[in-house]
Structure formats: C-alpha cells, structure tokens
Amino acid sequence: MRTPSRAFAGAAALIAAALVLTMGPGSVAAPGQDSDPGGPGPFPGDPVEVKDKDSRTGRAAPTAQQRARADEVGARARWNAYGTPAMLVSTGDPLATGLSDDPVAAAEAYVAANRDLLGLTARGAAALEVVTVAPIGDGAAVLLRQNFGGLAAGRDGLLAVGVRDGAVWHVSSSLARDAGQPAAATLSADEAAQIAVADAGVDETAVQGVELVAVPVPQRDARAAYEVVLIGNDESQPVGFTTYVDARDGSVLVREDLVDYSEDNPAWEVFPNTPPVDYSSTDTRVRWCFLPGPGCQEVVGTPASPLAWDVNSTNLKPSETTLGNNAFAVHNWFSNDPFTVGKELATPRPNREYDYAWTNQWLRERCSPAVFESALRNDIDAARANLFAMHNRMHDWSYHLGFTEVTFNLQDSNFDRGGKQNDPEQGNAQAGGVTGGPPTFAARDNANQITPPDGHPPITNMYLWQPIAGSFYAPCVDGDFDMSVIAHEYGHAITNRMVAGPRDGLSSPQGMSESWSDLLAIEYLAEHGYAPSGSRAFTIGEYVTSDPDAGIRNYNMSASPLNYSHIDYDFVGLQVHASGEVWSATNFDIRQALIGRYGAGNAALQKSCANGETPVTSCPGNRRWAQLMFDSYLLMAVSQVSMVDSRDALLAADMIRFGGANQDLLWNAFAKRGLGEGAASNGHTDPNPTPSFASPHANEAAVTFAPVDEAGQPVAGAQLFVGPYQARARAVADTAAATALGTTVQVVPGTYELLATAPGRGHVRIGPIALGAGSAVTLTVPMPTNLASSAAGATASGDGINLVRIVDDNEATNWASLGSPIAGKQVTVNLAGDNAHRVGRVQVSAMLRPPVTGDPDPGTQGRVSALRQFRVLACAATPANDCADAADFSLVYTSPADAFPSVAPRPRAPELIIRGFDIPDTRATHLRLEVVTNQCTGAPEYAGEQDADPRANTDCSTASAQARNVRVAEFQAFAVQ
C-alpha cells in the first residue's frame, strides 16, 4: 500500500506567530499536460472545457415594489435575469402562513397572493402547472412549470415552493414575468435537429429526441424552440447536450452539457465496497440475495424495487443476466465513445446464481492488453455483475430518500407511479477496454455519468485504471469494483434529475454536483456498514488510486482545512472537483454535528434506515443529514446554483421536514466554513465570493489583526486568511487603507489555522488557535522582513522566465524553466539592503497556477513540473567579489529529497504550498535556489516501468516532457532571530 502524503510531514513549518501549523492529510488533484503532445485526459480534477452556452441576453431588474414586498415578508431575496425571485429565503418566520394543508393548494394560493412579489402578470401566474409534488416529512416541495400558449417551458420557467402545515418556508424560481403565446414555429423539427447537430459538432446519429417547447428570454417574449437531445460520438471526451434551437430564426438559445466527470431468488457475488486494498487476489466477495435464503450473507430486496433486480419488466420474466428494471450492465470493450452502449450482457445463468469468477487478472497481469484475448477475459462477467448489483443498490437506497418515479428516477417501467419511464441506468463495464489505453489513454483512469432529461436513458462508463507517465499513476485495477466511484457517478444522475426539475440538469463551477456525488457515496457505504474505519470511510477512490487518505481528491473531507474563502484555491482554477471539496468539508461538519445531537445508532438501526424500514425521525444523525440533502435538491428550481443557494435550500429543508429543529446546528457549521450569514456569491460562477464566519445562533469571537515588524511597529498592507491558502483565496481582514475590509473579523467559536501575508514580509502561519464565544482577541502577528522580497528591495537573476515572480510574496505567480534538463537550474537573489545578513531560514513554495493568457508561461502547468528537492547556496559580496560567478557561492543547505512530498496518483495542492526550512546560520548578500529534482524526476512513485502494457513507458523522467520543466512560486529568506 502506498503511503499517504502529509502536507507538512518531514518539513519545517513556516514562521509561526503562535503554535506551529500542522496541516491535515494531503491529497489528490489532477495531472497537467503543458507540453506533452497528445496527452491523455481529462482525469479526475483536471480542467475540463466548459461547453454550456446561453445566448440569451439582457437582464430585468426587480421592481421597487418587489423589493419592498420581500422586505415586508422578511425574506432574503436573490433575483434572476427575468426580474423574478431566484430565491426567497426565510430569515426565521415563514414567508406566508394560513394556507391550505394541501401542498398544491397552498402553493397555488401563495402564487395568487404574491404576484407582486414574484413579479408575475396575471397571465404569467395562471400559466403554471404542477410538475410534481415531493413529500418532505410532513411538508412537501411543489414544483410548478409555466406554459406559454400551450407550450411547456423547456428551459427555466420553474417555481419550487417548500410548504409545511399551511406555511411557505422557501421559494426558488426561474419564472418569466409573463406567459404569452410565442410566435409560431417556422422551422421543422428535422431542421432544428440539423442545427443542433452542427452546433455540437456531432453527426446526425446523435439525435435522441426532438420536442417543441417554449424558452423564456429576459426582457422579451418567450420563444418557441425545439429541445434537441444529443448523444455524440467523440472518443476523446464524452459529448452530450440538450440544445434549445429557436423555432423561428434557427439560433441556438441554450446548450446544456449533459456529462458529469465516477431459481426464484436471484443472488450475486459482489464486493460491497472494493476488493482488498492491499491488492492481493483474495476473493472477499459476499453473496447478496434478493430474498432470504440458504447461503445468503445479505438480503438486498426492499420495496423500492417491486421486481427482483434481474426481472425484465416487459415480460415479467427473469433475464438470467445483468438486465432488469432499474439497470443493465454490458461490456463496451471496443468503443472509446462514452455515448455508445455495449450489447453483450453477462453470461446467462438460468439458475440466477450470478457468481462469476474473479481472478484479479488486470492487476496480476499488470495492465497487459493480452488479457482481453485470454480465457479469463479480464474477469468481465464478474465486473458486469458487480456493476449491475451496485446500480440496483443505489436505485433502492436513493428511492427511500426521495429519488422516486415522481422525482424523475431511473427505471424502465414506472409502474404507473408517475414520471417518464424507459430510462434505466445503462452501465458500460470496462468501457473502451480494448480500444482505449496508449497512446492517447482514452477510456482510462476515470468514470462518467451522462444524464439526459427524464424519459431518456442515462449512461455510465466505468473504465480500467493504469499508470500514465507524467499524468496519473493509478494501479492496474478495474473501476467496476470500486463502489465509491460507482456511487459517485450514480449520484450525478440523482442530482441532475432532482435539482431544477426533469429537464434542466445541474451546472455550477462552484462544484456542489461533484461534492454531492462524493457525499452520497460515502453515506451509502456508511449506512450499509461497508465503509472502512477511521478517516478512510471518507475517501473517494481509495482502490482505484492506491491513496487511502485522499483518493481522487486533494483532501479527505474529514480532515480538510478548506472554507468558502478557498473556492478558487487549486492550481487548476475554479473547477468543480477541487472547488466542490469546500462543500464536502462543510457537509462533513454538518453530518458530524447531527450525529452529535441524534447519535450514531448501531449497525442494525443504520441498515434499517438505509432500507427505508425506520422513519427518518427515529434514525441517527447521519441519516437525517442525508435526508435533508435530498430534500434540498427539490427546493432548487434553478440549475445554476451557488453554494450560498445550496446552503439556503438545506436550511429550508430543515424548516420543512424537522420544523427548524436544527437551524442552530446548521448555521454554526456553515459559519465555521465561511458560509455564514454574510456569505455572498455574485452568481454561480463567482471565483471570489465573500466568506462569512458569523452565525445568527452564535456569540462570535472578534479577532483583530495586528501585524508588527521587527521593531514592533504596525505592518501596512498585510492580509489575514482563514486556512492554509493565499493564492486565489479571499482575505478576511487586512491593514490596507485602500480597502473596506478592516482589521477585525467576527468568527464563530472554534479552532482555526490562519495565514498572514504582506509585501516585503512573506508568509506567516498562525495557529491552531482556539477562539472562545464572545472573546475579543488581538492577534499580534510578528512579520519579519523577507530579505528575498522585491518589495523589500531584493532582485532576482538566473535561469528561466518570470524571475521576478519568485520574489513577489505571492503564491499565485511562479518562476519556470522550460524545455531543458532541470537539474542545476537556478535563481540568484540579491538580498534586500546594502549589507550582508545572517540568514537562518528560507521559505519555498512549489505551487502551480492556472493558465494565464499572454504570460511567457501561458498554458496549463503540469503537476509533476513542480519543484521537489532543492539546494541553497550563499555568497557574501565584498569589494573584490561581486557574487557574479558560480564559484563564488558555497552550498549551505540541501533539502530533503521529498521537500515537497507527493505520492501516487499525482501531486496535489496541499503538498506544494509554501513551507519553511531552517538552514545553518549563514552570512550572505546573495542566496541561490538551485533545483535538484521536480516531482517527475524525483518522486519514487512516478519512476520505473509500472505495467506490462508494451504500448507505453510509465517512467516519468524518460517518458514525460515534464521532466524538462520545473516551477517554483516563492523563495523567501529571513534573518536569524
């Protein structure tokens, strides 16, 4: 087993104003490919091209009357582009009372009485029809949709009303003000389909369905449009869209990307979680039976599936293979196109004993492509059976939490219970097994879920994993056997169907969709008793990555330092996987707090709740949290939501289901992660939202930031951050006269790690420090001069490009040497001042950054190009020696070989951020930072031939162009104190 990284293990911490900061376990992120031609990808966490498009322009402002009405009812309002409420959030009291106990009648009465607040004309209000009514405990979420002269709204036009006992607690909408009949279509459905095909860059075989709908447009009448569902044929990346084509002028109004980047009693042999994570070939599968019977280790049938999993709903007979009402599983070895669905089901078993052989062949034969032609066929039957069983289990578990026919779930037959049918989960096992891999590594090291609108069958692709030079060092394993990955991908289907109704899907770079999928996966495993103990219970992808700590993420959510000031923290930029980790950490805290209030129960109670046998009001805290998550999905009628929107929906779900019993707990947990009552986001794409650490249910501590220099004098221009990141993070206090931020910040009680920075002062870590309720704390932070700072007068010379950026006190920029051997590459810093200094400490950052157009180093920065080991040399200039020659410098320090540690599958942000190193007391006017290795050339886990695939070499130093690139963000130097 590979050893998980610890971000500060084995390295001296930075200058500390209080206790030395020990950071939580490090973790995964994504491989960069800045100069490797034809490289693979994207892998989990990589930047992915945004393919959504909305060509509708204009924005209607809410009227003064609307704003006044919102204030009158005590609602916190956010407005959409139509000038109607995107969110009306209760601030304590209901938004309306005295309504009918019938949810639909209450919602309709609310609309009728609040047209002035909602901004609707009489015709706009009358055009609403009920889409679904989803129970939330004793309340419900009522989803209404506008009709425009007989045409249902295809995109937007939705209103979600959360009601309980005749009171409205939450409103979300994408309503148009009016609902007049659009001008009649002049294009045919076929013409619209051709336009959508051309716009998406796919062929005509991609068209899955065409329907005439209405699409509202801000400040204009709604347009008749054709909704065209496309499933494409691009082998390099999944391509699928719902495209709305104007039915009169042929323009593409909206294009939405559908892809998210993970006998009578039948029995299945399955891995409930994963095969052994020591990668032995011990078969630890258990026998699941649909009904009780001899030899069954677990009974899995529940009322969520009226038919046994392998019964064909068209003839009510057993399929005797991996096909049933909820899902089917096939192999798709011969196509890298994620939108194709294989044809070959598992080998039939007339006795319905799906106990196929598993030999661990892909791992034992080290990713050899010869496995596909062997008698064992790479354990494909076992893979199909495992994937099929896991999809059925997710169907049943989520059904008991509210993902049912009326909330647009995945079933071939809906048994006349509502919703559209003919859409079971289509599972491709070992997708692209034969055609994928080297040289492009298509169909490797990933998984995806494609979720079209209700009534169109979704597709999920599970891939094989293998090491890829300079990119992603996975073990040779099959993703069909890692339930955290399978459940994660199924989670995308859940949220894309439940949030914003059956058509709109879910789109936000702030990453809640990725986070929700992670959270659903860990909760499923926990409730069923399949999760490992300790922090590994919160790892996504341990088996497919060999990292028991963080898996495919940057952090294990149970030990994450992230908060809402860190949305853009990762060097891939604002990206759903990394940004979503903020939401995961927040929800982990909420889950733990609810367990603290309601207990964890025992294994029997957890399983009973998971199977829907025990009502949630009698379940442990974690099940209550899971239920609130599902309830919150139904309260969001907008697909493009921010974390603040999602926070408000979760708070409203608690008001509706539990009568607000947990508002204090929820608010305090949100505030601890920067999503407190003052948090704000400028839309769903805001990379720099406003954090708030204040709660309406807490007596906050007041922290006053007071940085001082060596003489005890105040430091101007300093910034204070909550957590370990400066680059692309948002400060919570500062001493800059030109900003409105101020020196004091209110924070809920708790323990915090902080970071201070200032021009000419470098980085100072603070804490952990405990802040008590109601305390007033003056945080005096010593900030000595960074002798290697350009702001203090230092200058840099040497190899490479962007030399000034290694001495700018800013981890958001970096120096690079590109395209030549890296060992010995150096930057020499002429230290601040005219005299020699006694230097006893340096601080170095290997942090990378997103692409910057026009920069000398403009592109994506490969992860393994980050510095790993370095040396420090010194020179003290004299009248006879100006430190101009290499011979003038003496070696004073060699860092540990893993100064910036990373392990498989790849480097990630926590391992690369700034850290401190004590060096011998050195008299110097000049210091030289010299590269020994980067991550590619120096990390043992990226070295050597790691598989038996003859088509590619896995050794990073010889097979990746990143071996010739190296980057450093900061070099800082401090005098002996």
Locations of the language-model features?
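Preferential activation on post-signal-peptide N-terminal prodomains/segments
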Residues: 25-190, 194-200
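A short, solvent-exposed beta-strand micro-motif common in secreted/extracellular proteins
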Residues: 748-760
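Aromatic, loop-rich ligand-recognition surfaces of beta-strand-rich domains
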Residues: 810-887, 908-977
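Extracellular zinc-dependent metalloprotease catalytic-domain scaffold
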Residues: 30-41, 65-68, 78, 207-209, ...
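Short, ordered, surface-exposed loop/turn motifs in non-cytosolic proteins
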Residues: 709-733
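Structured interaction patches on ligand/partner-binding surfaces of diverse proteins
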Residues: 759-784, 939
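A short, amphipathic beta-strand motif
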Residues: 702-710, 781
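Secretory targeting and sorting signals
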Residues: 2-30
